[in-house]
Structure formats: C-alpha cells, structure tokens
C-alpha cells in the first residue's frame, strides 16, 4: 500500500483541470500518442463542449519516481460545479490528497473555494498548483497570496506549471508522492469498498467505480450493498488506465471498477459501501459497519417537461428512463396539465443540472420539449387541529388559501465572490432577491460576500443576472440551510376565466402585484388576436390583481351599405355581435409555447 497514491484535482471551470489530467496521463504513458486526445477523461460531448466535468472518471497510472521505485497513482477526476457537490465529496473522500489548480492569471474563484473546503473537512492533503504560467498575464505572487488569504493553506511551495506546454508536470508528480500520504486501511480485514460513481453500460449493466478501503475483493465473490441490502455475484473487476483492464482482484487502497450484473442504477448508489455476503474459508467475511458519509441526494429544483406533440409522450418517457440509468440524482414522475397534456415533473440538483438534462434530451434523444418555470419545494402547514405538513413542488398543487396555516420556503447560504469594483451592483442585486447579508470579507482585490437567500429567488435567473451586473467576473456557490416561514402567495393566470395550470407561479407577496401585471402584459404580446375578445387576468385566490384585454378581429360588415337607414346598419352590427358572443362561449384560446417561457423572462 505504500506504493499507492490516490489523488484528485480541484479547480474552477476553465482553470485547466482536464488539460492537466491529460498531461499527467501522457507523462505516465497511460495512452499511446495516437489515442491521446484533448480532455481524455471527459467522455460526454456536452462535457467537452461546455468545458465542464459532470461524471467522475479515473485513471490508474504507473510512475517511476526519482527515488527509483514505481508508484501506482490513481487520478480521480471530480466534477467542479456546485450542483454536483455530493459527487465531489464522494470523489474526494476516496482520495488522500488533492491538487488545487488555480489559474495564475485569474486567481481563486468561488467554486474552487467550496470544493477546497470540502477537501479540508474530509482531511485531504491539499497541494496548490499554479497553472497557465505560460500566459503573459500570469501573476503567480498574487495568486499565491489569494490562496493563503481566501482558503488559508500555505502556498509558499505552490508548484508553477503549464498544462498546455507540459512544464512542471514532473514536479507535480513528485509532490504527489512526497507530500501526500499513502492510503490507510486494513489489507487483511473484511473488505469494504466505497462507490465513487456508477454508470450504465449496454452490454454488462451497471459499472461501479469503487475505492477499496479495507481487504480484498476477488472475481467470483458474492457482494452485498449495505444501503439497499442486496446481493450480487461479482463478475468482473479491474482498473482504468484510462482504458479498462481486467484484474483478478482489487486490494485495499486501490481504485477500480466492479461489474456484478446489476440492472438498474438505483441499486448502486454513489457513496454506498460494498462488502461480502458471508464468511467463507477463503475470505475475511462481511464488514459490520458501512463507511461514513453516505446520504440520499434530494433534488432542489423542480420543473415540468412536456413533449410538444402528445404522441411523443412514450419517447420522452423512454428517454428519461435511459438518462436516469446514468444519472441517479434525476427524479421524475408523470403529471397531467390541462394546458400542456401529458408530461413529467422532474427534480434536479440545481440549475446547471436542469440545463444539462434538457440539453441531453434534445441532443441525444431528439426530443422537442416545453419546460415550465422551475420551482422549489415548499413546506405547507395545513390549518385545523391535525395541522399536517405537506411538501408542494408544483405551484398548481398548492392547497386553497383558506386551508393553509403557513408556508415555509427553502433558504440557502450563498457565497458570492467578485473583484471589488462590482460589489455595489452585486449587493443591489442580492437585496432585490430578498437576500440578507451575513458577512463581507476583503481578500486583496477580491471580495467575498455571504448572504442568506430564498432558493426560489435563485432558481429563476439569479445566476444570469449576477454574471451581467459583474461583467462575468463574479462567481457563486450555494448550500441548503433550512426551511423558514415566508409570506408567499400563488398567482394564477386566467384566460377568459379559465385557469391555465402550467402558468401558475409562487411568489413573495411584496412582488405579487408586480409579477402578475408583468406576466399578463407579456401574455398580451404573445397570444394572437382571436375572433372574439380575450381577457387575460392574474389572480391570487379569488382576487384579480391584473387584467389585459386582447381586442377581437372584426370584419367591416357595413362595407356594403351605402347611405341608407341607420336601423339597417344596426341590424348588421347586432348580428355580428351575437355571432361573436356565441363564438366566445364555445371557442378556446390556443396558448403558444413561448408563453410558458415568457414567465421566465419577467424582470424584477
């Protein structure tokens, strides 16, 4: 075990993490030059295109160090985005060390800080690395000062490197060996392995990426998942180097993959512990306690996804099922809307996760989707003696006002990180979104603001606005804090007196008048004129708070009258009016797809 090092790379988006991983793999001869391509570990198209890492990947590499011994280095590539923070914490807990990669020309960013704190909490040894030293605007001294200031780890021995040109790679590998500890564990004890990630393969079923903590697992063992208490025969195991290589056994300290003929991903939950089913003469028996830190992931943001054509409902269901195979944090259940027909209510970890799922559905499965406004989960305390608490994740399911004692909304702690020139506009934005400032700290030229905010205010468009008021320099991350009672109301949109359920929104009372008016005005622009008058209203319960009319199109029925008696003209006009009235009773207004997106574009 002394010759094994497990490490991962922590970095903000675009600070060069995947390129650095490529160089390390190349230096250790993991792939031939022909197979080497940019961002080897990012296997999804969407990961390459957005330049982000979503799923964890690993590479087991052999490196001959300067002391002449050969070490096995396991590089575990972690996602860097705040939505995937649970996956990050699992990847990090499988490591003893982490390389903190900071772009020498940009300094530290919010997500780097968040992931770095996660690493320090898990007791991981962090080695700072300054990347992009080949750029003319690289400022290593400032970057070191920021690392010490913001994260509070010693950056004096930070390693300068450039993943692009390949300078400093050997120094990094030596630091991994000398500065990071070897894995701890009991090589002879009962086997325990932690699932870092799992995905679905069409040929072999679920593939689990695991870190062996104690003991040995051999091909042919019967293994038990501790969270779900299910047993499977172990069919194949091995390591990724970065291409998969089969082995006969995995020993404590190693990182590799297990294949056990599991059919659905729910059985192999990220963070779960794998051990043996029972004691046999040739093994050490099952472990009694699982590894700490496993938790079920709860979705934070919900939205409805509907096919544009009702006939494509089945294809959408199949597409979601396939996506769920590779994304255990996605939740969905069927739902029916009067306006949009059959579709699904989906739960996501956060906004980026939602965008990625939508994009993958449109891209890989060729789906045309209508998405409703994202909403969060509210806790509703019902009145009366029983006073039960229900969770409402869809605005149209909110009980009537009379039955509600109080509504609680999710509050999150938000860390905003930006150059000091933009503090003013960012604070104004945070206050508009009902943020309460908790802290403000200056680190050199950078400022870190800490706010408490309702999650509902963030899910709509906070991130886009933050980027625009700070010209793209601000970064943020957030974590759930608690549920808190709030004065929120449900605003319904009525068209000719009929509720359109997919357009309901839940907003704070102070903004309800304004939001209602804005949505109604927007609808008026979008809905085309009909043969009869259309009234668009916004209502809270039975109170109408805003109204717009769309005037009817009408034919000039008097065109054929030249002069003549007024009563003749009146007869024609009355006849037209009666016809319009009859039409209005039986006609229904077609709500175009843009209307559902319009809700998202209402400014505060």
Swiss-Prot record:
| Domain of life the protein comes from | Bacteria
Q: Record's Gene Ontology CC terms?
A: plasma membrane
Q: Identify the residues that bind GTP.
A: 14-19, 131-134
GO terms, molecular function: GTP binding; GTPase activity; guanosine tetraphosphate binding; ribosome binding; translation elongation factor activity
Keyword vocabulary terms for this entry: Cell inner membrane, Cell membrane, GTP-binding, Hydrolase, Membrane, Nucleotide-binding, Protein biosynthesis
Coarse class of the protein's main subcellular location: membrane
Its record classes its membrane topology as: Peripheral membrane protein
Q: Which GO terms describe its biological process?
A: positive regulation of translation
Q: Where is the tr-type G domain?
A: 2-184
Task: List the CDD domains hit by this protein, alphabetically.
Answer: EF4_II, EF4_III, LepA, lepA_C
**What PROSITE patterns does the record point to?**
G_TR_1, G_TR_2
SMART domains assigned:
EFG_C
EC top class, as a word: hydrolase
**Compartment(s) where it occurs, according to its Swiss-Prot or TrEMBL record:** Cell inner membrane
Q: Give the protein's function.
A: Required for accurate and efficient protein synthesis under certain stress conditions. May act as a fidelity factor of the translation reaction, by catalyzing a one-codon backward translocation of tRNAs on improperly translocated ribosomes. Back-translocation proceeds from a post-translocation (POST) complex to a pre-translocation (PRE) complex, thus giving elongation factor G a second chance to translocate the tRNAs correctly. Binds to ribosomes in a GTP-dependent manner.
User: What is the name listed in the Swiss-Prot or TrEMBL entry for this protein?
Assistant: Elongation factor 4
Source species: Methylibium petroleiphilum (strain ATCC BAA-1232 / LMG 22953 / PM1)
